[in-house]
From Swiss-Prot:
Activity regulation, free text: Allosterically activated by HslU binding.
Enzyme Commission numbers on file: 3.4.25.2
Catalytic site positions: T2
Hydrolase recorded as keyword: yes
GO MF terms held by the record: metal ion binding; threonine-type endopeptidase activity
HAMAP family reported in the protein's UniProt record: HslV
Enzymatic class: hydrolase
An annotated GO BP: proteolysis involved in protein catabolic process
UniProt-recorded name of the protein: ATP-dependent protease subunit HslV
Protein family membership: Belongs to the peptidase T1B family. HslV subfamily.
UniProt keywords, alphabetically: Allosteric enzyme, Cytoplasm, Hydrolase, Metal-binding, Protease, Sodium, Threonine protease
Domain of life (superkingdom): Bacteria
């Protein structure tokens, strides 16, 4: 699977992801880019789950962002409604972590939209490791959101066999 982590602190939001693509117990690719900028570079998005499924979701989510002029919450809720009602989408196995300058959200494979506490998101096979590390760093250091995301992803990659050390990191400063 993968690890995606998003951290918000001091007018900065970051989404970071590793690059490993696995098929069963085999590493197929080590430098996949699972974090992207959407809607005129104003929205960050990362995915965990099936790669083809995630690209389908990225396309649909970007269309919703365009439809709602970049309003993240409205686009996410509309995407979730589609996910629940569209037979094809219901079969997609992926999670999206999305963020802009106002909020951070998880869009789940069940069609749920979750705004996490503390604006900390972690999804994927190494998500619990990354979340634990990021929580400790948020509570006990003055590191930037970028530094916390990078360090927590490194820790997850050291522990989770489905997460590697190749990182894609996108940040928004506001």
């Amino acid at each position: 699977m993968t690890t995606i982590v998003s951290v918000r602190r001091n007018n900065q939001v970051v989404i970071a992801g590793d690059g490993q693509v696995s098929l069963g117990n085999t590493v197929m690719k080590g430098n996949a880019r699972k974090v992207r900028r959407l809607y005129h570079n104003k929205v960050l998005a990362g995915f965990a789950g099936g790669t083809a499924d995630a690209f389908t979701l990225f396309e649909r989510f970007e269309a919703k962002l365009e439809m709602h002029q970049g309003h993240l919450m409205k686009a996410a809720v509309e995407m979730a409604k589609d996910w629940r009602s569209d037979k094809m989408l219901r079969k997609l196995e992926a999670l999206l972590a999305v963020a802009d300058d106002t909020c951070s959200l998880i869009i789940t494979g069940n069609g749920d939209v979750v705004q996490p506490e503390n604006d900390l998101i972690s999804i994927g096979s190494g998500g619990n490791f990354a979340q634990s590390a990021a929580t400790a760093l948020l509570e006990n250091t003055e590191l930037s959101a970028l530094e916390i995301a990078e360090k927590s992803l490194t820790i997850a990659g050291d522990i989770c066999v489905f997460t590697n050390q190749f990182k894609t990191i996108e940040e928004l400063n506001y």
